[in-house]
Amino acid sequence: MAALPDKEKLLRNFTRCANWEEKYLYIIELGQRLAELNPQDRNPQNTIHGCQSQVWIVMRRNANGIIELQGDSDAAIVKGLMAVVFILYHQMTAQDIVHFDVRPWFEKMALAQHLTPSRSQGLEAMIRAIRAKAATLS
């Protein structure tokens, strides 16, 4: 995930955007920076339900106990929102993910009020799925 910024830089970059059109473009750019998801990982086990778009998220624990997230979506904005979530959970253990609340970060970014209801629901579905899977790994 070297191409993605850390949490603080994400927030700085986001607040530097002049308007919501620029912010959406930045979110899309973040999604484009995600590593390609292996075709075999696009399976029902990794599908996130509750999203209008097709979304797949793969979670693996590395040798140091850190959770590594990979994902893909057929929608550019959703893939960008996925990248934002991955940035917020970067370098965390499964237990860290279970206890970390991403919502204050979304509030700092004023993200929730600028998403359509279906995108907000999809974002919540991604977060719930990641936290639920992390709970089984912790």
Swiss-Prot record:
Gene3D superfamilies: 3.90.1010.10
Cell compartment(s), UniProt: Cytoplasm
Source superkingdom: Bacteria
A single cellular component GO annotation: cytoplasm
SUPFAM superfamilies: SufE/NifU
Keyword Cytoplasm assigned: yes
Annotated catalytic residues: 51
Pathway in which this enzyme or protein is active: Cofactor biosynthesis; iron-sulfur cluster biosynthesis
Pfam family, one: SufE
Biological process (GO), any one: sulfur compound metabolic process
InterPro entries to which the protein is assigned, alphabetical: Cysteine_desulfuration_SufE (IPR023939), Fe-S_metab-assoc_dom (IPR003808)
Record keywords, A-Z: Cytoplasm
HAMAP family in the record: SufE
Family: Belongs to the SufE family.
Function field: Participates in cysteine desulfuration mediated by SufS. Cysteine desulfuration mobilizes sulfur from L-cysteine to yield L-alanine and constitutes an essential step in sulfur metabolism for biosynthesis of a variety of sulfur-containing biomolecules. Functions as a sulfur acceptor for SufS, by mediating the direct transfer of the sulfur atom from the S-sulfanylcysteine of SufS, an intermediate product of cysteine desulfuration process.
Subunit details: Homodimer. Interacts with SufS.
Protein name: Cysteine desulfuration protein SufE
Protein species of origin: Salmonella typhimurium (strain LT2 / SGSC1412 / ATCC 700720)
Classification lineage: Bacteria, Pseudomonadati, Pseudomonadota, Gammaproteobacteria, Enterobacterales
